[in-house]
């Protein structure tokens, strides 16, 4: 038999998973075991929640007595360093199973009685804003015990970034972490991606196209929340491939008041038929703004950034065009001049390549900034796959970054040039004895030369 047909032994097998209960038990055990075995990975998942730097101990299905009933959380994680100890209960859901508020409240009560620091939940639910929990509980129970949430996408992203980019010192530990990644990426693991815009997506989409959507309509809030969750998912997946943290861009008020962000999205959707957000990738020229226009059926990504501060208008435009060698010719460029009101001169890249002057509305005005945008067709289906809204947004972001943004560099002024002694007037007077030369290099020479030109 050919070796190609042999199945390589796996540390965490996916065969034999029957039902969601077995799926959750296996995912919990695999994750917690790898957290305790791989030092850097365990630290990456626990340190943000206040755990000290130390060895991670992990346990599954630890029983507790709460009043007259028995409570069994999916897991318990403990980190100890010297006399300081941090512990958290862990609740896990896989597949389409969602967290239950009543169950989490009982775990918060157990954690308070036992002196634990937190309850950590893991599921496929992606909250629209980082730090926000997808499940509502009695806030009084959070006074002494913190509650944190991680999506499986976040867990997988952290695992990939730790292994492929940040690194794992011990080769055996790196292999173990790789086995967890293989497991979580398998369809049977129950660690799913963002794959549903919700049951309200289709009626809200149709209401937008018909012009009948109102802010009070049922389901409009859910669509707004899921769009923000989609952007968070896009950040996690893109960050996993780039090896850096990609984050949604939110104002301070939007971060502290999720309701304000949702109302803003709903207002834009009702008034203009658009869902808009932005993501930030480190070291890029600008944040990427993503706009899904439900009326036009398009997804547009764009960046705004400063033009060079010197040179003629044509020189500044050519500076940008040279950086867009790999960009599609349908990319749209808009040039904004100083003290200009309203939109600037705009055209497609293929036109600007042939005639940069099309982006100059007034040669007497200095070009101050550019906008580069790419538009693609928006999918309409609520789920994943061909023709889906989710995939059309994800593809638009990935393509725009790969073909445009990663090639753009911000302008920086050239450093001043230091004149050498060879530039002195004396050096140019060949055959004249040094003692007879009466001229020498002066700081005023460049000024005179500039006037002569």
Segment roles from a protein language model:
Residues 1-453:
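Charged, terminal alpha-helix-loop-beta segments
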């Amino acid at each position: 038999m050919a070796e190609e047909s042999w199945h390589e032994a796996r540390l965490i097998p996916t065969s034999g998973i029957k039902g969601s209960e077995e799926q959750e038990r296996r995912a919990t055990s695999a994750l917690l075991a790898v957290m305790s075995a791989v030092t850097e990975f365990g630290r990456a998942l626990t340190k943000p929640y206040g755990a000290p730097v130390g060895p991670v101990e992990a346990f599954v299905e630890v029983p507790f007595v709460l009043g007259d009933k028995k409570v069994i959380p999916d897991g318990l994680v403990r980190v100890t360093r010297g006399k300081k100890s941090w512990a958290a209960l862990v609740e896990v859901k896989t597949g389409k199973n969602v967290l239950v508020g009543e169950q989490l409240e009982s775990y918060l009560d157990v954690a308070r009685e036992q002196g634990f620091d937190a309850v950590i939940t893991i599921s496929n639910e992606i909250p629209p804003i980082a730090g926000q929990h997808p499940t509502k509980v009695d806030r009084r129970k959070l006074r002494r015990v913190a509650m944190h949430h991680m999506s499986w996408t976040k867990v997988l992203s952290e695992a990939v970034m730790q292994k492929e980019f940040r690194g794992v010192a011990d080769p055996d530990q790196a292999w173990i972490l790789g086995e967890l990644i293989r497991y979580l990426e398998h369809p049977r693991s129950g660690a799913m991606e963002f794959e549903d815009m919700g049951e309200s997506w289709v009626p809200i989409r149709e209401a937008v196209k018909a012009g009948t959507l109102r802010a009070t309509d049922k389901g409009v809030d859910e669509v707004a929340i899921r769009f923000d969750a989609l952007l968070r998912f896009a950040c996690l997946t893109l960050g996993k491939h780039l090896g850096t943290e990609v984050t949604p861009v939110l104002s301070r008020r939007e971060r502290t008041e999720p309701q304000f962000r949702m109302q803003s999205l709903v207002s834009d959707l009702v008034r203009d038929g658009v869902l808009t957000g932005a993501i930030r990738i480190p070291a890029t020229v600008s944040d990427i703004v993503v706009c899904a226009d439900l009326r036009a059926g398009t997804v547009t990504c764009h960046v705004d950034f400063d033009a060079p501060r010197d040179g003629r208008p044509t020189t500044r435009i050519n500076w940008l065009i040279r950086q867009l060698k790999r960009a599609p010719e349908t990319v749209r460029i808009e040039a904004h001049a100083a003290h200009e009101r309203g939109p600037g001169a705009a055209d497609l890249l293929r036109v600007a390549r042939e005639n940069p002057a099309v982006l100059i509305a007034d040669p007497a005005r200095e070009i101050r900034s550019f906008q580069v945008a790419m538009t693609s067709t928006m999918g309409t289906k609520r789920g994943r796959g061909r023709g889906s809204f989710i995939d059309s947004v994800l593809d638009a972001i990935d393509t725009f970054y790969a073909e445009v943004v990663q090639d753009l560099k911000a302008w920086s002024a050239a450093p001043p040039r230091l004149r050498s002694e060879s530039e002195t007037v004396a050096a140019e007077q060949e055959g004249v004895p040094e003692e007879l030369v009466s001229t020498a290099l002066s700081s005023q020479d460049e000024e005179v030369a500039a006037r002569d030109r």
